[in-house]
Amino acid sequence: MEKIIVRGGKQLNGSVKMEGAKNAVLPVIAATLLASKGTSVLKNVPNLSDVFTINEVLKYLNADVSFVNDEVTVDATGEITSDAPFEYVRKMRASIVVMGPLLARTGSARVALPGGCAIGSRPVDLHLKGFEAMGAVVKIENGYIEATAEKLVGAKVYLDFPSVGATQNIMMAATLAEGTTVIENVAREPEIVDLANFLNQMGARVIGAGTEVIRIEGVKELTATEHSIIPDRIEAGTFMIAAAITGGNVLIEDAVPEHISSLIAKLEEMGVQIIEEENGIRVIGPDKLKAVDVKTMPHPGFPTDMQSQMMVIQMLSEGTSIMTETVFENRFMHVEEMRRMNADMKIEGHSVIISGPAKLQGAEVAATDLRAAAALILAGLVADGYTQVTELKYLDRGYNNFHGKLQALGADVERVDDSKVDVTNLASLF
């Protein structure tokens, strides 16, 4: 079994370059299915297990896909099938984003109910509501969602919650629909804007991405194009916190301040120095951190994908902090693992009461989801002694070479196979 071992106490310094955004690249890869002409070329693609998974889904659907270095090419000009099987979709909830493109391109879609991180209920109802509004017949049978439509027709769709996945799926389906589709109360994340830009480069007519209302005028066909994926704001935020908690001085290259303004505001409240530079964001950690309360919200609010990492810096701050989760239920499973490291945390409903500053102690802990994996490694950076983090399958879904990037900044961190390493003598690793 692989694990990451961290010896706490090192200050991080230097620079680290961000990769393409996981949450942007997956829907963009799915959107290549809409192109009936040409070959799509996607650049700045991160080397993540989720990317390999969605590439496999597209291959199964009869697209020709290659992934070399940071570039994915997709030729979807052949006869695309419409059945995305459980063996792939179970690995990753985001696989459902192929449903909109399949429905638009082939008139039908059969996609297994999704899997992925176990962080509460993320119902697909909003996706299906949009498809039905455009004229699709939808049914759920034997663990599969089946949708068919002789033709999709533009419609007005109101989302009860600004779901990122539903916004993306309905937006993609609407690109080839007859007439105009208006989606209200949509997600406004930067990843939505990136997808809209890609669709428009293909010949779609998408207006309003980044606002609360998106308008799509359907076209007859889309043509493949070249596109570079935006930098990953969650990876950037994770490294910003790593720099802050270690009292370091780190330049986060390619980070876009406008994409993480809520995180920047909270870190500055805590006493962290944030400097916007020409090629990124510099973070300088303070001697003492001030306690702040945080509530996750849809963008432009504080991102739920930064919740567990933010809790690490909250538990190191002086005083009492509160973290409130409003986007997903059951996203506090990492709290028990952090308590093993001597964090003083108490769950009360949708909030966690955090008393600090904690004197963290190294322990063996298990990641419970993707962002929790990163958070536990961050905690290890400032814990006394050695922290061993297992269940790295979660980490690999969203971070490429996380330990290597931390090493380059000066952290004592190693990724090891414990069947080949004497974990009873951890000092020998460093």
UniProtKB/Swiss-Prot annotation:
This is UDP-N-acetylglucosamine 1-carboxyvinyltransferase 1. The modification 2-(S-cysteinyl)pyruvic acid O-phosphothioketal is found at residue 117. The lineage of its organism: Bacteria, Bacillati, Bacillota, Bacilli, Bacillales. PANTHER family: UDP-N-ACETYLGLUCOSAMINE 1-CARBOXYVINYLTRANSFERASE. Phosphoenolpyruvate binds at residues 22-23. The gene is murA1. Cell wall formation. Adds enolpyruvyl to UDP-N-acetylglucosamine. Belongs to the EPSP synthase family. MurA subfamily. One of its GO terms (molecular function) is UDP-N-acetylglucosamine 1-carboxyvinyltransferase activity. Keywords: Cell cycle, Cell division, Cell shape, Cell wall biogenesis/degradation, Cytoplasm, Peptidoglycan synthesis, Pyruvate, Transferase. It holds the Pfam family EPSP_synthase. UDP-N-acetyl-alpha-D-glucosamine binds at residues 93, 122-126, 305, 327. It catalyses: phosphoenolpyruvate + UDP-N-acetyl-alpha-D-glucosamine = UDP-N-acetyl-3-O-(1-carboxyvinyl)-alpha-D-glucosamine + phosphate. The active site is at 117 (proton donor).
